[in-house]
Amino acid sequence: MARVKGGVVSRKRRKRVLKLAKGYYGAKHILFRTAKEQVMNSYYYAYRDRRQRKRDFRKLWITRINAAARMNGLSYSQLMHGLKLAEVEVNRKMLADLAVNDAAAFTVLADAAKEKLGK
């Protein structure tokens, strides 16, 4: 039986890693060992930052809602509490969109919150 050395498989594996490392800076897209390390790190960063992105967007929405709420004489927490008392079920993403693109509609919601808070 002939001896199998596995050159084809190794080349295919290395080629796959180097293809994933395409566009990386310096030796990280040329040398197999550094490319492999960087690809592994990239997978880690992608996994971590998919979760981070959710936190970042929520933070952005809250900042936008707070700015619009203060233009209407309320703080963010007062607005959210007032909306809960008024039984208005609008999520933060929708509120932030209203704050940026439809100030009149946001003002209506802020007035409803003020009314329930007794302001």
Curated annotation (Swiss-Prot):
It comes from the Bacteria. Coiled coil: none annotated. Keywords: Ribonucleoprotein, Ribosomal protein, RNA-binding, rRNA-binding. Pfam families: Ribosomal_L20. GO terms for molecular function: rRNA binding; structural constituent of ribosome. The keyword Aminoacyl-tRNA synthetase does not apply. GO terms for biological process: ribosomal large subunit assembly; translation. InterPro entries: Ribosomal_bL20, RIBOSOMAL_L20_CS, Ribosomal_protein_bL20_C. CDD domains: Ribosomal_L20. GO terms for cellular component: ribonucleoprotein complex; ribosome. Belongs to the bacterial ribosomal protein bL20 family. Binds directly to 23S ribosomal RNA and is necessary for the in vitro assembly process of the 50S ribosomal subunit. It is not involved in the protein synthesizing functions of that subunit. PANTHER family: 39S RIBOSOMAL PROTEIN L20 (PTHR10986). This is Large ribosomal subunit protein bL20.
